[in-house]
From Swiss-Prot:
GO biological process: heme catabolic process; iron import into cell
EC number assigned by the record: 1.14.14.18
Lineage, uppermost ranks: Bacteria, Bacillati, Bacillota, Bacilli, Bacillales
Oligomer status and interactors: Homodimer.
InterPro entries: ABM_dom, Dimeric_a/b-barrel, Heme-degrading_MO, IsdG
Family statement drawn from the similarity comment of this UniProt entry: Belongs to the antibiotic biosynthesis monooxygenase family. Heme-degrading monooxygenase IsdG subfamily.
Chain ranges of the ABM domain: 2-101
Name the UniProt record assigns to this protein: Heme-degrading monooxygenase
Length: 121
């Protein structure tokens, strides 16, 4: 299992704009059904942090995949390109990057999972 994170650093106050782009709340973000129907997709979470001692906020996009191949197939898909404002297989994105300072993508292999234990009463 693979977890991919995209940590997006944004100017203070700009996080809601970025969150809407990923949740599809403004009509042009990740349509839930597009990623949910991708073979090998296991889940998606969006995290938001407001560090008090920093002049920025962070939005962390996390996706869980059966394999690295499944995740790479999503990135190559037309649905991914459309959701990210791309028309070609390129890193160039739409110009609407309001408030985004930068981002960092990381891939992790899951080596252990601890699930909660159910205690019978």
């Amino acid at each position: 299992m693979i977890i991919v994170t995209n940590t997006i650093k944004v100017e203070k106050g700009a996080a809601e704009h970025v969150i809407r782009q990923f949740t599809g709340a403004n009509g042009d973000g990740h349509p839930t059904k597009d990623i949910a129907e991708v073979e090998g997709f296991l889940g998606f979470e969006l995290w938001h942090s407001k560090p008090e001692d920093k002049d920025y906020e962070e939005v962390v996009v996390t996706s869980k995949w059966e394999s690295e191949e499944a995740q790479r197939n999503w990135v190559k898909s037309d649905s991914f390109k459309k959701a990210h404002g791309r028309t070609k297989d390129t890193r160039e994105q739409r110009e609407d990057r309001k408030g985004i300072v930068g981002n960092e993508i990381a891939r992790f292999e899951v080596v252990h999972v601890q699930n909660p234990v159910t205690i019978e009463k």
